[in-house]
């Protein structure tokens, strides 16, 4: 397709989406206040006057409440979010000054998939989301908890984040793309995080979620629109990558087909048969006289059929009978006596014993043996002249059955029955021939075997180069014995017809190709289950399940440079520069990169008039010669503070500063909990009210006002019954690739891009997958022949991982 046509189509798509974005399809938005039916909610919310009268506004009171979506609303929300990469949350809010609270939260159990929070104490807006199964937080410094009305709109387009406040673009960031496929059970909360945390105090109006590009236009129609959006661009890139993959696969299949055709054109293999040491070519026929069969070699297999005997047209004075050594019956004269017809060899008892021979009854002079039974038990067998006792063993007399048949006794006679694997040749089963199960296809030999007929049975022989699996199956190689298998070292290898199968040993899980040790209680914080119920913990954690963080600072494992101090982090630590020092940009782990700040050279000192600034390690001093100008006063915010003067900072009522000899010293307000007028905002530790306590995120522990704790990579503080949490401060890094290991909160430098969590993809650095297909950097695919293995190209490196849940289900 010509490039100009593509550009025209792209312009049409963008224009159409822009128009739709301005009009906002009602099917692609959710009015949260309407869906939650706040008009009929009485506990914790009250309808009040809003910024305008076009919609209802509600006051969220400082009481326990549960404002969340009904199941049908949650399901609607899940469907709207599914596979969406463009969405905007907007609302008009008036937040109580200096408070913290969650405006909107979409969560499932403890996982926040979308959460917008405003913190008054830290003066920032926070966006919480999930990426790659891990929580992420974007902290956007802005004071919204000031008691004034604000319009807020947070827009996400793939990895592009926009924050508008009062129709002004406040922040624009690149983030990790959030997970939008919400799991079943997800719930929407308004004005709180869950039942017990994050209560918003103030008024909310016009709460909506828009699932289209440029959703902020609904709130601020005069703002500029973006086309294409980040999501549009990424969709286009993904489409190109998909087409590239499809073309590569089709090329690979075509090359394989051409190779196979070339092999077939050059291949001619005649299949022969070998019987009793003789070699027969394909379609050769021969007579197996011993077994009365006609045999033919067909494609390497012997097919035999019993000879078809011609129909006998015996004369009226003869009967067809079997003659020893012949396959077909012949006509022999019959005998008639007293109306009874006798065939050749049959006997009849008259006054004497006679046998039919050549159409004549010949007298037999054999004497009958004496009987040792009563006369009532005497019986006359068929075609015999001598009586016998009932229960007589007819089979013990002269053999009548051939070697391949067995004699069976009956009341008055004995009959012959063919043994297993044989069939009658002469009709009465006295003469039996072997059944050729191979030729008759009555065998159970599987692939890679040759059926070999044996007297009364058959055998499945492996073709050359194959080994036996069982009585009926063979495999090409002894994969298990030779080590030519792909079973995990913790799997059991079994040879099969197709090659081999792998089964994980007890205590391990997987598909046999990959077997992972199974620990019933799991290994926390990135621990590895190395053997059944045995964890190996990563550095920084300990315990049988790696559940305990090691405080490297408190345990004395770390010795930071004297220009820095040790700060413990979950699973790690870092040396933070002390006051008066800053990092030189190399960010050494031990703090050696902390160097003195020269306040004199930078003119950040407070020395006044004729006093001279003298730089000191970690600070400065003011040296003034004697004279009237050496007052020791301090310049501050464009004014002057006198030597010895004490004051409270205008922007921080909890900090007290003093001027001494030209230098300003600031500290937190000293707290006297015995003073009934103590400021509880600055001295929360003096607040003993039960209502000022905070429940931690697990709902298991209470904290007093002023207490601090760490939870899920966030630093939390309880202030007058309100818990405010913000992301832990992490040290800066100067490396190309970083990774946050499981259980840790801060990134570390890694040299392998496969380990990197945050990576800038260079589309010039492509990868070749196992099938020879070229992949762009950032592309993700499933490994051929391994549906549970996912691979990604990271700047020229192929990085693959195995999904254990998938292995267990396949």
From Swiss-Prot:
Ca(2+) binds at residues 434-435, 437, 453-454, 457. Glycans are attached at residues 40, 53, 83, 224, 294, 372, 511, 562, 609, 708. Disulfide bonds join 395-407, 401-416, 418-432, 438-451, 445-460, 462-474, 480-493, 487-502, 504-515, 519-529, 523-535, 537-546, 553-566, 560-575, 577-594, 600-613, 607-622, 624-630. Keywords: Calcium, Cytoplasm, Differentiation, Disulfide bond, EGF-like domain, Glycoprotein, Metal-binding, Nucleus, Repeat, Secreted, Signal. Residues 57-227 form the Laminin G-like domain. GO terms for cellular component: cytoplasm; extracellular region; nuclear envelope; perinuclear region of cytoplasm. One of its GO terms (molecular function) is calcium ion binding. One of its GO terms (biological process) is regulation of gene expression. Residues 271-332, 632-687, 692-750 form the VWFC domain. It is found in: Cytoplasm; Nucleus envelope; Secreted. Residues 434-475, 476-516, 517-547, 549-587, 596-631 form the EGF-like domain. SMART domains: EGF, EGF_CA, LamG, TSPN, VWC, VWC_out. PANTHER family: NEL HOMOLOG, PROTEIN KINASE C-BINDING PROTEIN NELL1. It has been demonstrated that ROBO3 binds to both NELL1 and NELL2. However, NELL1 is not expressed in the spinal cord at the time of commissural axon growth to the midline and has no significant effect on commissural axon repulsion in vitro, suggesting that NELL1 is not a functional ligand for ROBO3 in commissural axons. It remains possible, however, that NELL1 functions as a ligand for ROBO3 at another spatiotemporal location. This is Protein kinase C-binding protein NELL1. The lineage of its organism: Eukaryota, Metazoa, Chordata, Craniata, Vertebrata.
């Amino acid at each position: 397709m010509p490039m100009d046509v593509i550009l025209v189509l792209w312009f049409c798509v963008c224009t159409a989406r822009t128009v739709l974005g301005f009009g906002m399809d009602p099917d692609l938005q959710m009015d949260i206040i309407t869906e939650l039916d706040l008009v009929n909610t009485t506990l914790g919310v009250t309808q009040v006057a809003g910024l305008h009268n076009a919609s209802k506004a509600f006051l969220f009171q400082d009481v326990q409440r549960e404002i969340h979506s009904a199941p049908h609303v949650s399901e609607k929300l899940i469907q709207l979010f599914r596979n969406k990469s463009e969405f905007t949350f907007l609302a008009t809010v008036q937040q109580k000054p200096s408070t913290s609270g969650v405006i909107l939260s979409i969560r499932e159990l403890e996982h926040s998939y979308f959460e917008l929070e405003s913190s008054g104490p830290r003066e920032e807006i926070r966006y919480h989301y999930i990426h790659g199964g891990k929580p992420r937080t974007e902290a956007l410094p802005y004071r919204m908890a000031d008691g004034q009305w604000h319009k807020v709109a947070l827009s996400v387009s793939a990895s592009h984040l926009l924050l508008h406040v009062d129709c002004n673009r406040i922040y624009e960031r690149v983030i990790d793309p959030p997970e939008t496929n919400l799991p079943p059970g997800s719930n929407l909360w308004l004005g709180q995080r869950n039942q017990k945390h994050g209560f918003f105090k103030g008024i909310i109006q016009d709460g909506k979620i828009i699932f289209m590009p440029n959703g902020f236009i609904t709130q601020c129609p005069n703002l500029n629109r973006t086309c294409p959006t980040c999501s549009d661009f990424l969709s286009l890139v993904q489409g190109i990558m998909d087409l590239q993959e499809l073309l590569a696969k089709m090329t690979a299949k075509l090359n394989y087909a051409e190779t196979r055709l070339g092999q077939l054109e050059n291949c001619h293999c005649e299949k022969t048969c070998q019987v009793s040491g003789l070699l027969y070519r394909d379609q050769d026929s021969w007579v197996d006289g011993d077994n009365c069969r006609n045999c033919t070699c067909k494609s390497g297999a012997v097919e035999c059929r019993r000879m078809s005997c011609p129909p006998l047209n015996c004369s009226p004075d003869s009967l067809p009978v079997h003659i020893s050594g012949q396959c077909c019956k012949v006509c022999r004269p019959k005998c008639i006596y007293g109306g009874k017809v006798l065939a050749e060899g049959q006997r009849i008892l008259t006054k004497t014993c006679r046998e039919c021979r050549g159409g004549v009854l010949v007298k037999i002079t054999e004497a009958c043996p004496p009987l040792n039974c009563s006369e009532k038990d005497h019986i006359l067998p068929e075609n015999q002249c001598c009586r016998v006792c009932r229960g007589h063993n007819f089979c013990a007399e002269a053999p009548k059955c051939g070697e391949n048949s067995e004699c069976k006794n009956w009341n008055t006679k004995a009959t012959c029955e063919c043994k297993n694997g044989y069939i009658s040749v002469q009709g009465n089963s006295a003469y039996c021939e072997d059944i050729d199960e191979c030729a008759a296809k009555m065998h159970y030999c599987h692939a890679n075997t040759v059926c070999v007929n044996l007297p009364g049975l058959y055998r499945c022989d492996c073709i050359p180069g194959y080994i036996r699996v069982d009585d009926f199956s063979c495999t090409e190689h002894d994969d298990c014995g030779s080590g030519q298998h792909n079973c995990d070292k913790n799997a059991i290898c079994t040879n099969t017809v197709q090659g081999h199968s792998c089964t994980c040993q007890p205590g391990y899980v997987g598909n046999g190709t990959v077997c992972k040790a199974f620990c019933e209680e799991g290994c926390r914080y990135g621990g590895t289950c190395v053997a059944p119920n045995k964890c190996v913990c990563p550095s920084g954690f300990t315990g049988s399940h790696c559940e305990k963080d090691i405080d490297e600072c408190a345990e004395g494992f770390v010795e930071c440079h004297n220009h820095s101090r040790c700060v413990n982090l979950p699973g790690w630590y870092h040396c933070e520069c002390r006051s008066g020092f800053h990092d030189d940009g190399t960010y050494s782990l031990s703090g050696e990169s902390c160097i003195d700040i020269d306040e004199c050279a930078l003119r950040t000192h407070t020395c006044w008039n004729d006093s001279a600034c003298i730089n000191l390690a970690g600070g400065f001093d003011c040296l003034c010669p004697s004279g009237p100008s050496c007052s020791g006063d301090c310049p501050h915010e464009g004014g002057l503070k006198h030597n010895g003067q004490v004051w409270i900072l205008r922007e921080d009522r909890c900090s007290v500063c003093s001027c001494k000899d030209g230098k300003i010293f600031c500290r937190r307000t000293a707290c006297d909990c015995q003073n009934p007028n103590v400021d509880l905002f600055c001295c929360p530790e003096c607040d003993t009210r039960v209502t000022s306590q905070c429940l931690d995120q697990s709902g298991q522990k209470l904290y007093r006002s002023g207490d601090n704790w760490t939870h899920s990579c966030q630093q939390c503080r309880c202030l007058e019954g309100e818990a405010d949490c913000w992301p832990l401060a992490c040290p800066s890094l100067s490396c190309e690739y970083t990774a946050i290991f499981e259980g840790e909160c801060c990134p570390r430098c890694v040299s392998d891009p496969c380990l990197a969590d945050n990576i800038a993809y260079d589309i010039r650095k492509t990868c070749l997958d196992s099938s020879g297909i070229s992949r762009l950097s950032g592309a993700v695919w499933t490994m051929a022949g391994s549906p549970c293995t996912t691979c990604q190209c990271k700047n020229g490196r192929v990085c693959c991982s195995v999904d254990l849940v998938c292995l267990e289900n396949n």
